[in-house]
Amino acid sequence: MNEPKRFKHESTTLEHLPNELFVDIFGYLNGVDTVYAFSYLNNRFQCLINDYVRDFDFKSVSKAKFHFITQSHQIHQWRSLCLSDGDQTPGQIKSFCQLFPLAQHIHQIRTLAVLDMTPKYAVEFLPQIESFQHLTSLSIGKVCGFNIQSIQLPSLKRLVLTSCKYTSWIMVRDFDVMLIIVNLFLF
């Protein structure tokens, strides 16, 4: 009977490319795809991912991939985050917040997008946004039917709200220079 073949680690041409090239490539990819594709290949890639991948868009990510990324990457270094409770990702926002209470784990976020949030959960989630003192861009998508309370975000420069006509609007205070985009949808 033949012995099972053992795989030897042989260096590939890809592994001889400089780190700077990989950092540039990672910049063109969503952090979710980068971490999912390059994690645990070798120590070099793992270090590059941990040091340079900071932007994560979970808008259309499966639950399995979502859990893999959140368990295998250091979220306290994230710079940008997009969460969605859309048709493909129901309950994602609540699941993320249960795993990682916002004020404790991702207070360093600079760009935050929360999309398709249910009104019931928005009442719990939105007051926590004030803990993001470094937030420069905030997008809140498709919230409808409730009062959005006043929040203070001193670093905020860009605010995008997508809502319906049944939402009482947020009170915006203390903004020097800010781009505000408001989208209304009717249903």
Go through each PLM region and give its residues.
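The conserved beta-strand core of Leucine-Rich Repeat
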Residues: 1-187
